[in-house]
UniProtKB/Swiss-Prot annotation:
Gene label: nadK
Family (UniProt): Belongs to the NAD kinase family.
Name recorded for this polypeptide: NAD kinase
GO biological process, one term: NAD metabolic process
Keywords from the UniProt entry: ATP-binding, Cytoplasm, Kinase, NAD, NADP, Nucleotide-binding, Transferase
Species, as recorded: Staphylococcus saprophyticus subsp. saprophyticus (strain ATCC 15305 / DSM 20229 / NCIMB 8711 / NCTC 7292 / S-41)
Cell location: Cytoplasm
Length: 269
């Protein structure tokens, strides 16, 4: 089995990474950061997001597993004291592969049709660089839907619906559903300006095209990465054809994670 390990970079995570590498030598597992079959992140959900972006070019050929050295995460489901068990499972087991939907973002510029393509595991947001009101036309499936005015828009995946989207009042969506969700960030609603005022859930075959009305510099975030764009013509969002693959060696139910993260006090029986 070819593997690679990405660490959060703190002392605890780095020590655990080196411990795992030494232990994996006993199983004749090969460390191969260029062509891994399994990508192990040690840290938290942020570390796994970084691992996803680093290996997004080979999603069909590798699977991800997370070890959390801090708080319980939605993606990192193994504890530091379980690493030896995990290594044995990786070496001996045919692991189950669970696939989650991703978000495709295509930024189109006014410069001779130039465009860039990105993938997000959690969400993408769109705002103005200087914090002024974002004014954009929202087009769904080729039809004008609304003119949005506000701080910005957040477009999330099902697994990302528990992150920024939840803080914006969006719905929680099970990752088995291939969909994306659009949530407003502080929209302006009065007698003159109106938006739908509710999160929108779009299925896989629906595309959302967002066109800036003014030529402001647009600030986008794609998971943990912030990018400034000038001279933007439009940004297209849809459910990506690619999916992220997680290696599962034991059950890790989505709704239990939601309960443990947002409801459980730690004292539940």
């Amino acid at each position: 089995m070819r593997y690679t390990i990405l660490s959060k970079g703190d002392s605890k995570s780095n020590a655990l990474k080196h411990k795992m590498i030494n232990h994996m030598k006993d199983f004749q597992m090969v460390e191969d950061p260029d062509n891994p079959e399994i990508v192990i992140s040690v840290g938290g959900d942020g570390t796994l997001l970084q691992a996803f972006h680093q290996y997004s070019y080979m999603l069909s050929r590798c699977a991800f597993v997370g070890i959390h050295t801090g708080h319980l995460g939605f993606y990192a489901d193994w504890l530091p004291h379980e690493v030896e068990k995990l290594i044995i499972e990786i070496n001996n087991s045919e692991f189950q592969v669970i696939e989650y939907p991703l978000l495709e973002i295509i930024v189109r510029y006014n410069d001779n049709g130039y465009e860039t393509r990105h993938l997000a595991l959690n969400e993408a947001t769109m705002k103005t660089e200087n914090g002024s009101t974002l004014v954009v036309d929202v087009n769904i499936r080729g039809n004008q839907f609304e003119r949005f005015r506000g701080d910005g828009l957040c477009i999330s995946t099902p697994s990302g619906s528990t992150a920024y989207n939840k803080a914006l009042g969006g719905a929680l969506i099970h990752p088995s559903l291939e969909a994306m969700q659009i949530a407003e960030i502080a929209s302006i609603n009065n007698r003159v300006f109106r938006t739908v005022g509710s999160p929108l859930v779009l299925p896989k075959h629906h595309t959302c095209l967002i066109t800036p009305v003014n030529q402001d510099t647009i600030l986008t975030t794609i998971d943990h990465v912030s990018i400034k764009h000038k001279n933007v013509n439009a940004i297209q969002y849809r459910v990506a054809n690619e999916k992220i693959r997680f290696a599962r060696f034991r059950p890790f139910p989505f709704w239990k994670r939601v309960h443990d993260s947002f409801i459980s006090s730690g004292d539940d029986e």
